[in-house]
Protein backbone atom coordinates (compact mmCIF):
# COMPACT_ATOMS: atom_id res chain seq x y z
CA UNK A 1 0.00 0.00 0.00
CA UNK A 2 1.43 3.44 -0.89
CA UNK A 3 2.51 5.73 1.94
CA UNK A 4 0.34 8.68 2.92
CA UNK A 5 2.98 10.94 1.34
CA UNK A 6 2.80 9.03 -1.94
CA UNK A 7 -0.99 9.10 -1.84
CA UNK A 8 -0.89 12.86 -1.26
CA UNK A 9 1.40 13.36 -4.24
CA UNK A 10 -0.93 11.30 -6.39
CA UNK A 11 -3.93 13.37 -5.30
CA UNK A 12 -2.07 16.61 -6.05
CA UNK A 13 -1.04 15.34 -9.48
CA UNK A 14 -4.64 14.35 -10.24
CA UNK A 15 -5.92 17.78 -9.20
CA UNK A 16 -3.29 19.50 -11.34
CA UNK A 17 -4.24 17.47 -14.39
CA UNK A 18 -7.97 17.95 -13.80
CA UNK A 19 -7.96 21.65 -13.00
CA UNK A 20 -5.21 22.71 -15.34
CA UNK A 21 -2.88 23.60 -12.52
CA UNK A 22 0.86 23.39 -13.00
CA UNK A 23 3.94 22.90 -10.93
CA UNK A 24 5.86 26.01 -9.83
CA UNK A 25 8.84 27.17 -11.87
CA UNK A 26 11.97 25.54 -10.52
CA UNK A 27 14.99 27.39 -9.21
CA UNK A 28 17.95 27.61 -11.59
CA UNK A 29 20.54 24.85 -11.56
CA UNK A 30 23.72 26.77 -10.69
CA UNK A 31 25.96 24.25 -12.46
CA UNK A 32 24.35 24.12 -15.89
CA UNK A 33 22.65 27.51 -15.81
CA UNK A 34 19.35 26.07 -16.96
CA UNK A 35 16.23 25.81 -14.81
CA UNK A 36 15.36 22.37 -13.50
CA UNK A 37 12.62 22.15 -16.14
CA UNK A 38 15.16 22.61 -18.92
CA UNK A 39 16.21 25.37 -21.29
CA UNK A 40 14.00 28.15 -22.60
CA UNK A 41 13.21 28.03 -26.32
CA UNK A 42 11.08 31.14 -26.73
CA UNK A 43 9.69 32.83 -29.83
CA UNK A 44 7.90 36.08 -30.49
CA UNK A 45 4.56 35.74 -32.29
CA UNK A 46 3.27 38.99 -33.80
CA UNK A 47 -0.47 39.60 -34.02
CA UNK A 48 0.03 41.50 -37.29
CA UNK A 49 1.51 38.34 -38.77
CA UNK A 50 -1.98 36.90 -39.25
CA UNK A 51 -2.60 39.38 -42.08
CA UNK A 52 -0.22 39.65 -45.05
CA UNK A 53 2.13 37.00 -43.75
CA UNK A 54 -0.83 34.66 -43.11
CA UNK A 55 0.93 33.15 -40.11
CA UNK A 56 -1.61 31.91 -37.57
CA UNK A 57 -1.13 30.56 -34.02
CA UNK A 58 -1.74 27.02 -35.27
CA UNK A 59 1.37 27.40 -37.48
CA UNK A 60 3.63 27.58 -34.42
CA UNK A 61 5.81 24.48 -33.83
CA UNK A 62 4.32 24.31 -30.34
CA UNK A 63 6.04 21.11 -29.22
CA UNK A 64 9.43 22.78 -29.76
CA UNK A 65 8.60 26.01 -27.90
CA UNK A 66 8.74 26.76 -24.18
CA UNK A 67 7.39 30.33 -24.36
CA UNK A 68 5.33 32.20 -26.95
CA UNK A 69 5.84 35.94 -26.51
CA UNK A 70 2.63 37.42 -27.91
CA UNK A 71 3.35 40.82 -29.43
CA UNK A 72 2.38 43.52 -28.75
CA UNK A 73 0.03 45.22 -26.36
CA UNK A 74 0.02 49.00 -26.16
CA UNK A 75 0.01 51.27 -23.12
CA UNK A 76 -1.15 54.78 -22.33
CA UNK A 77 0.87 57.37 -20.45
CA UNK A 78 -1.23 56.74 -17.31
CA UNK A 79 -0.05 53.13 -17.34
CA UNK A 80 -3.15 51.45 -18.72
CA UNK A 81 -2.26 48.43 -20.86
CA UNK A 82 -4.63 47.69 -23.73
CA UNK A 83 -4.99 45.74 -26.95
CA UNK A 84 -3.70 47.54 -30.03
CA UNK A 85 -5.66 45.24 -32.36
CA UNK A 86 -8.71 43.74 -30.66
CA UNK A 87 -9.88 41.97 -33.84
CA UNK A 88 -6.66 39.99 -34.12
CA UNK A 89 -6.37 39.45 -30.38
CA UNK A 90 -9.88 38.50 -29.26
CA UNK A 91 -12.49 38.87 -32.02
CA UNK A 92 -11.38 37.04 -35.16
CA UNK A 93 -13.34 33.84 -35.70
CA UNK A 94 -11.24 30.94 -36.92
CA UNK A 95 -12.80 28.07 -38.94
CA UNK A 96 -13.83 26.02 -35.89
CA UNK A 97 -15.22 29.00 -33.95
CA UNK A 98 -18.99 29.24 -33.67
CA UNK A 99 -20.92 32.43 -34.28
CA UNK A 100 -23.75 31.13 -32.08
CA UNK A 101 -22.01 30.69 -28.72
CA UNK A 102 -23.94 31.98 -25.73
CA UNK A 103 -22.29 34.36 -23.29
CA UNK A 104 -19.21 36.57 -23.30
CA UNK A 105 -16.50 34.61 -25.12
CA UNK A 106 -13.00 35.25 -26.37
CA UNK A 107 -11.83 34.32 -29.87
CA UNK A 108 -8.95 35.50 -32.06
CA UNK A 109 -5.33 34.62 -31.44
CA UNK A 110 -5.98 34.43 -27.71
CA UNK A 111 -8.32 31.45 -28.03
CA UNK A 112 -6.05 29.77 -30.56
CA UNK A 113 -3.03 30.11 -28.26
CA UNK A 114 -5.02 28.69 -25.36
CA UNK A 115 -5.97 25.66 -27.46
CA UNK A 116 -2.27 25.19 -28.24
CA UNK A 117 -1.55 25.34 -24.51
CA UNK A 118 -4.09 22.60 -23.84
CA UNK A 119 -2.49 20.36 -26.45
CA UNK A 120 1.10 21.25 -25.45
CA UNK A 121 1.30 21.56 -21.67
CA UNK A 122 4.94 22.71 -21.70
CA UNK A 123 4.24 25.73 -23.92
CA UNK A 124 3.73 28.90 -21.89
CA UNK A 125 2.25 32.13 -23.26
CA UNK A 126 3.60 35.54 -22.33
CA UNK A 127 1.85 38.86 -22.85
CA UNK A 128 4.43 41.15 -24.46
CA UNK A 129 3.87 44.87 -23.90
CA UNK A 130 5.45 47.75 -25.80
CA UNK A 131 7.96 47.06 -28.53
CA UNK A 132 9.85 49.55 -30.64
CA UNK A 133 6.73 51.38 -31.87
CA UNK A 134 4.79 51.36 -28.60
CA UNK A 135 7.49 52.24 -26.08
CA UNK A 136 6.77 55.98 -26.16
CA UNK A 137 4.58 55.98 -23.05
CA UNK A 138 6.79 53.85 -20.81
CA UNK A 139 8.63 56.80 -19.20
CA UNK A 140 5.37 58.39 -18.05
CA UNK A 141 3.76 55.07 -17.12
CA UNK A 142 6.73 54.17 -14.90
CA UNK A 143 7.16 57.61 -13.33
CA UNK A 144 4.81 57.44 -10.31
CA UNK A 145 3.54 54.82 -7.90
CA UNK A 146 0.00 55.40 -9.17
CA UNK A 147 0.84 54.89 -12.85
CA UNK A 148 3.02 51.87 -12.05
CA UNK A 149 0.17 50.33 -10.10
CA UNK A 150 -2.21 51.02 -12.96
CA UNK A 151 0.19 49.36 -15.39
CA UNK A 152 0.59 46.29 -13.20
CA UNK A 153 -3.11 45.86 -12.48
CA UNK A 154 -4.24 46.38 -16.08
CA UNK A 155 -1.53 44.06 -17.44
CA UNK A 156 -2.37 41.27 -15.00
CA UNK A 157 -6.09 41.72 -15.67
CA UNK A 158 -5.54 41.12 -19.38
CA UNK A 159 -3.19 38.24 -18.62
CA UNK A 160 -5.76 36.37 -16.52
CA UNK A 161 -8.68 37.25 -18.82
CA UNK A 162 -6.74 35.91 -21.80
CA UNK A 163 -5.33 32.85 -20.05
CA UNK A 164 -1.62 33.69 -20.25
CA UNK A 165 1.28 32.48 -18.10
CA UNK A 166 3.18 35.70 -17.58
CA UNK A 167 4.17 39.15 -18.78
CA UNK A 168 7.05 40.32 -20.97
CA UNK A 169 7.92 44.03 -20.91
CA UNK A 170 9.58 45.40 -24.05
CA UNK A 171 10.64 48.96 -23.17
CA UNK A 172 12.97 50.22 -25.91
CA UNK A 173 14.76 51.84 -24.08
CA UNK A 174 15.14 53.68 -20.76
CA UNK A 175 16.99 56.87 -21.67
CA UNK A 176 18.65 57.77 -18.37
CA UNK A 177 19.24 56.66 -14.80
CA UNK A 178 15.89 57.95 -13.55
CA UNK A 179 14.00 55.97 -16.18
CA UNK A 180 16.13 52.90 -15.47
CA UNK A 181 15.30 53.15 -11.76
CA UNK A 182 11.61 53.57 -12.57
CA UNK A 183 11.79 50.53 -14.84
CA UNK A 184 12.82 48.39 -11.87
CA UNK A 185 9.98 49.84 -9.78
CA UNK A 186 7.52 49.16 -12.61
CA UNK A 187 8.65 45.56 -12.89
CA UNK A 188 8.48 45.08 -9.13
CA UNK A 189 4.89 46.36 -9.19
CA UNK A 190 4.08 43.78 -11.87
CA UNK A 191 5.83 41.03 -9.89
CA UNK A 192 3.81 41.91 -6.79
CA UNK A 193 0.56 41.94 -8.75
CA UNK A 194 1.34 38.58 -10.37
CA UNK A 195 2.05 37.06 -6.96
CA UNK A 196 -1.11 38.53 -5.47
CA UNK A 197 -3.20 37.06 -8.28
CA UNK A 198 -1.52 33.66 -7.92
CA UNK A 199 -2.12 33.63 -4.16
CA UNK A 200 -5.84 34.15 -4.74
CA UNK A 201 -6.57 32.17 -7.90
CA UNK A 202 -3.58 29.93 -8.77
CA UNK A 203 -1.92 28.84 -5.56
CA UNK A 204 1.46 27.22 -6.13
CA UNK A 205 1.79 28.58 -9.67
CA UNK A 206 4.54 31.05 -10.54
CA UNK A 207 3.54 33.51 -13.25
CA UNK A 208 6.68 34.50 -15.12
CA UNK A 209 8.05 37.99 -15.73
CA UNK A 210 10.59 38.84 -18.42
CA UNK A 211 11.87 41.74 -20.48
CA UNK A 212 13.35 42.19 -23.92
CA UNK A 213 16.75 43.79 -23.36
CA UNK A 214 19.27 45.58 -25.61
CA UNK A 215 22.64 44.20 -26.70
CA UNK A 216 24.13 47.62 -27.45
CA UNK A 217 26.25 49.05 -24.61
CA UNK A 218 24.90 52.58 -25.09
CA UNK A 219 21.51 51.21 -24.03
CA UNK A 220 22.30 48.47 -21.51
CA UNK A 221 24.87 50.54 -19.61
CA UNK A 222 21.98 52.75 -18.49
CA UNK A 223 20.08 49.81 -16.98
CA UNK A 224 20.18 48.75 -13.33
CA UNK A 225 21.27 45.25 -14.27
CA UNK A 226 21.69 43.84 -10.77
CA UNK A 227 18.20 44.95 -9.76
CA UNK A 228 16.71 43.55 -12.96
CA UNK A 229 18.42 40.25 -12.23
CA UNK A 230 16.59 40.07 -8.91
CA UNK A 231 13.05 40.93 -10.02
CA UNK A 232 12.89 39.06 -13.35
CA UNK A 233 12.64 35.41 -14.29
CA UNK A 234 14.31 35.99 -17.66
CA UNK A 235 16.05 38.69 -19.65
CA UNK A 236 15.57 38.09 -23.37
CA UNK A 237 18.75 39.58 -24.84
CA UNK A 238 18.10 41.00 -28.30
CA UNK A 239 21.46 39.96 -29.73
CA UNK A 240 20.68 41.10 -33.25
CA UNK A 241 20.23 44.26 -35.33
CA UNK A 242 23.96 44.90 -34.95
CA UNK A 243 23.89 46.48 -38.42
CA UNK A 244 21.51 48.07 -40.90
CA UNK A 245 20.82 51.12 -43.02
CA UNK A 246 22.51 53.32 -40.37
CA UNK A 247 25.80 51.42 -40.54
CA UNK A 248 28.98 52.83 -42.05
CA UNK A 249 29.87 49.48 -43.62
CA UNK A 250 28.17 46.22 -44.44
CA UNK A 251 28.33 44.19 -41.24
CA UNK A 252 27.11 41.13 -39.40
CA UNK A 253 23.58 41.22 -38.00
CA UNK A 254 24.07 38.88 -35.03
CA UNK A 255 27.68 37.70 -34.72
CA UNK A 256 28.91 35.99 -31.58
CA UNK A 257 32.33 37.66 -31.42
CA UNK A 258 34.28 40.64 -32.69
CA UNK A 259 36.62 40.10 -35.62
CA UNK A 260 39.84 42.03 -34.80
CA UNK A 261 40.95 41.66 -38.41
CA UNK A 262 37.74 43.24 -39.73
CA UNK A 263 36.24 45.48 -37.05
CA UNK A 264 34.06 47.26 -39.60
CA UNK A 265 32.19 43.96 -39.99
CA UNK A 266 31.58 43.61 -36.24
CA UNK A 267 30.62 46.95 -34.67
CA UNK A 268 28.86 44.95 -31.92
CA UNK A 269 29.01 41.37 -30.73
CA UNK A 270 26.99 39.02 -28.55
CA UNK A 271 29.77 37.84 -26.25
CA UNK A 272 30.60 41.32 -24.97
CA UNK A 273 26.94 41.96 -24.15
CA UNK A 274 26.51 38.64 -22.34
CA UNK A 275 29.66 39.22 -20.29
CA UNK A 276 28.61 42.75 -19.40
CA UNK A 277 25.18 41.62 -18.21
CA UNK A 278 26.76 38.97 -16.02
CA UNK A 279 29.34 41.43 -14.66
CA UNK A 280 26.46 43.83 -13.98
CA UNK A 281 24.83 41.34 -11.64
CA UNK A 282 22.42 39.36 -13.81
CA UNK A 283 22.58 35.61 -13.08
CA UNK A 284 23.69 33.85 -16.26
CA UNK A 285 20.78 31.43 -15.96
CA UNK A 286 18.33 34.33 -16.38
CA UNK A 287 19.84 35.49 -19.68
CA UNK A 288 18.07 34.09 -22.73
CA UNK A 289 20.03 34.51 -25.97
CA UNK A 290 17.98 36.19 -28.68
CA UNK A 291 18.53 35.17 -32.30
CA UNK A 292 17.10 36.60 -35.54
CA UNK A 293 14.98 34.68 -38.02
CA UNK A 294 15.77 37.26 -40.69
CA UNK A 295 18.67 38.76 -42.59
CA UNK A 296 19.96 42.31 -43.08
CA UNK A 297 20.89 43.29 -46.64
CA UNK A 298 23.47 45.68 -48.09
CA UNK A 299 23.62 46.78 -51.72
CA UNK A 300 26.58 47.60 -53.96
CA UNK A 301 29.23 46.36 -51.57
CA UNK A 302 32.44 44.47 -52.26
CA UNK A 303 32.15 42.31 -49.15
CA UNK A 304 31.62 42.21 -45.40
CA UNK A 305 33.01 45.28 -43.64
CA UNK A 306 33.07 47.28 -46.89
CA UNK A 307 31.17 50.44 -47.90
CA UNK A 308 27.67 49.93 -49.32
CA UNK A 309 25.01 51.95 -51.10
CA UNK A 310 21.50 51.35 -49.82
CA UNK A 311 19.83 48.27 -48.36
CA UNK A 312 17.41 47.40 -51.16
CA UNK A 313 13.97 45.93 -50.69
CA UNK A 314 12.97 43.08 -48.39
CA UNK A 315 10.30 40.55 -47.52
CA UNK A 316 8.10 43.09 -45.68
CA UNK A 317 10.29 46.14 -45.17
CA UNK A 318 13.37 47.47 -46.91
CA UNK A 319 16.65 45.79 -46.04
CA UNK A 320 15.14 42.89 -44.07
CA UNK A 321 14.59 39.41 -45.52
CA UNK A 322 12.76 36.49 -43.93
CA UNK A 323 15.13 33.62 -43.22
CA UNK A 324 12.84 31.23 -45.11
CA UNK A 325 13.67 32.90 -48.46
CA UNK A 326 17.44 32.88 -47.92
CA UNK A 327 19.88 32.48 -49.49
CA UNK A 328 18.68 34.06 -52.71
CA UNK A 329 19.29 32.28 -55.99
CA UNK A 330 22.79 32.99 -57.30
CA UNK A 331 24.25 33.92 -53.91
CA UNK A 332 27.09 32.09 -52.17
CA UNK A 333 26.89 31.46 -48.41
CA UNK A 334 30.08 32.47 -46.56
CA UNK A 335 31.12 31.75 -42.97
CA UNK A 336 33.19 34.16 -40.88
CA UNK A 337 34.96 31.74 -38.57
CA UNK A 338 36.32 34.52 -36.34
CA UNK A 339 33.13 36.51 -35.76
CA UNK A 340 31.01 33.35 -35.95
CA UNK A 341 28.45 34.60 -38.42
CA UNK A 342 27.09 33.72 -41.86
CA UNK A 343 26.22 35.90 -44.81
CA UNK A 344 25.36 35.41 -48.45
CA UNK A 345 26.99 37.34 -51.27
CA UNK A 346 26.10 37.66 -54.94
CA UNK A 347 29.09 38.72 -57.06
CA UNK A 348 26.82 39.76 -59.92
CA UNK A 349 24.44 42.03 -57.98
CA UNK A 350 26.92 42.91 -55.19
CA UNK A 351 24.21 42.23 -52.60
CA UNK A 352 25.30 40.96 -49.18
CA UNK A 353 22.80 39.57 -46.64
CA UNK A 354 23.84 38.71 -43.08
CA UNK A 355 21.61 36.07 -41.47
CA UNK A 356 21.56 33.11 -39.10
CA UNK A 357 21.62 29.55 -40.43
CA UNK A 358 20.93 26.20 -38.71
CA UNK A 359 24.69 25.73 -38.29
CA UNK A 360 25.21 29.03 -36.49
CA UNK A 361 22.10 28.37 -34.40
CA UNK A 362 23.71 25.13 -33.21
CA UNK A 363 26.91 27.03 -32.48
CA UNK A 364 25.01 29.66 -30.49
CA UNK A 365 23.27 26.97 -28.43
CA UNK A 366 26.66 25.41 -27.68
CA UNK A 367 27.86 28.88 -26.67
CA UNK A 368 24.90 29.64 -24.40
CA UNK A 369 25.27 26.27 -22.69
CA UNK A 370 28.96 26.94 -22.09
CA UNK A 371 28.11 30.31 -20.51
CA UNK A 372 25.38 28.84 -18.30
CA UNK A 373 22.64 30.89 -19.98
CA UNK A 374 18.94 30.11 -19.72
CA UNK A 375 18.19 29.26 -23.34
CA UNK A 376 17.23 30.69 -26.73
CA UNK A 377 14.77 33.32 -27.96
CA UNK A 378 13.77 34.09 -31.56
CA UNK A 379 12.31 37.08 -33.41
CA UNK A 380 9.94 36.20 -34.99
CA UNK A 381 7.98 33.03 -35.76
CA UNK A 382 6.52 33.78 -39.20
CA UNK A 383 9.94 34.11 -40.88
CA UNK A 384 11.11 30.59 -40.03
CA UNK A 385 11.28 27.57 -42.31
CA UNK A 386 9.36 24.41 -41.57
CA UNK A 387 11.09 21.06 -41.34
CA UNK A 388 14.72 20.22 -40.54
CA UNK A 389 16.06 23.69 -41.44
CA UNK A 390 13.80 25.48 -38.94
CA UNK A 391 15.90 27.68 -36.64
CA UNK A 392 13.40 27.25 -33.80
CA UNK A 393 13.48 23.48 -34.26
CA UNK A 394 17.26 23.40 -34.61
CA UNK A 395 17.60 25.23 -31.30
CA UNK A 396 15.08 22.97 -29.58
CA UNK A 397 16.90 19.85 -30.71
CA UNK A 398 20.32 21.18 -29.72
CA UNK A 399 19.00 22.25 -26.32
CA UNK A 400 17.64 18.76 -25.73
CA UNK A 401 14.04 19.92 -26.00
CA UNK A 402 12.40 22.98 -24.44
CA UNK A 403 11.73 23.66 -20.76
CA UNK A 404 9.16 21.16 -19.45
CA UNK A 405 7.63 23.39 -16.78
CA UNK A 406 3.86 23.18 -17.25
CA UNK A 407 1.55 25.99 -18.24
CA UNK A 408 -1.66 26.97 -16.46
CA UNK A 409 -5.12 26.21 -17.83
CA UNK A 410 -7.39 27.21 -14.96
CA UNK A 411 -8.45 30.89 -14.97
CA UNK A 412 -11.54 31.06 -12.75
CA UNK A 413 -11.51 34.86 -12.66
CA UNK A 414 -11.39 35.44 -16.43
CA UNK A 415 -14.17 37.68 -17.70
CA UNK A 416 -14.68 35.29 -20.62
CA UNK A 417 -17.08 32.39 -20.18
CA UNK A 418 -15.24 30.01 -22.51
CA UNK A 419 -11.89 30.77 -20.84
CA UNK A 420 -13.32 29.97 -17.41
CA UNK A 421 -14.63 26.70 -18.90
CA UNK A 422 -11.18 25.95 -20.39
CA UNK A 423 -12.66 25.98 -23.92
CA UNK A 424 -14.54 22.78 -23.10
From Swiss-Prot:
GO terms for molecular function: chitin binding; endochitinase activity. The keyword Hydrolase applies. Residues 392-408 have a biased composition (Polar residues). PROSITE patterns: GH18_1, GH18_2. GO terms for cellular component: extracellular region. Glycans are attached at residues 74, 78, 96, 248, 347. Residues 39-402 form the GH18 domain. It catalyses: Random endo-hydrolysis of N-acetyl-beta-D-glucosaminide (1->4)-beta-linkages in chitin and chitodextrins. The keyword Electron transport does not apply. The active site is at residue 172. Keywords: Carbohydrate metabolism, Chitin degradation, Chitin-binding, Glycoprotein, Glycosidase, Hydrolase, Polysaccharide degradation, Secreted, Signal, Virulence. It is found in: Secreted. SMART domains: Glyco_18. CDD domains: GH18_chitinase. Residues 1-22 form the signal peptide. Chitin binds at residues 103-104, 130-133, 173, 238-241, 379. One of its GO terms (biological process) is chitin catabolic process. It is an enzyme of class 3 (hydrolase). Its EC number is 3.2.1.14. Residues 385-412 are annotated as: Disordered. Pfam families: Glyco_hydro_18. Secreted chitinase involved in the degradation of chitin, a component of the cell walls of fungi and exoskeletal elements of some animals (including worms and arthropods). Participates in the infection process and directly acts in the penetration process of the host cuticle. Belongs to the glycosyl hydrolase 18 family. Chitinase class V subfamily. This is Endochitinase 1. It comes from Metarhizium robertsii (strain ARSEF 23 / ATCC MYA-3075) (Metarhizium anisopliae (strain ARSEF 23)). The lineage of its organism: Eukaryota, Fungi, Dikarya, Ascomycota, Pezizomycotina. The gene is chit1.
Amino acid sequence: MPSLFAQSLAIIATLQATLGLATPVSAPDTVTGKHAGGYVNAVYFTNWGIYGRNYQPADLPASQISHVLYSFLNLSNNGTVYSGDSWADIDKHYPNDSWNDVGNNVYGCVKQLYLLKKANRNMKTMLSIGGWTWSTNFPAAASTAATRSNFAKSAVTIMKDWGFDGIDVDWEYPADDAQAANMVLLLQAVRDELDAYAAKFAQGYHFQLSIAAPAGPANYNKLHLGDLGKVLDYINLMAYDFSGSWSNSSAHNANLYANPGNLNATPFNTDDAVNDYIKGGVPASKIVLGMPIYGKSFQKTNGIGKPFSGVGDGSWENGIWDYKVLPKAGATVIYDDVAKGYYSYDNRTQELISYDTPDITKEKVTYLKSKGLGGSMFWEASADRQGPDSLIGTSSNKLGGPDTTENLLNYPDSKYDNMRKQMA
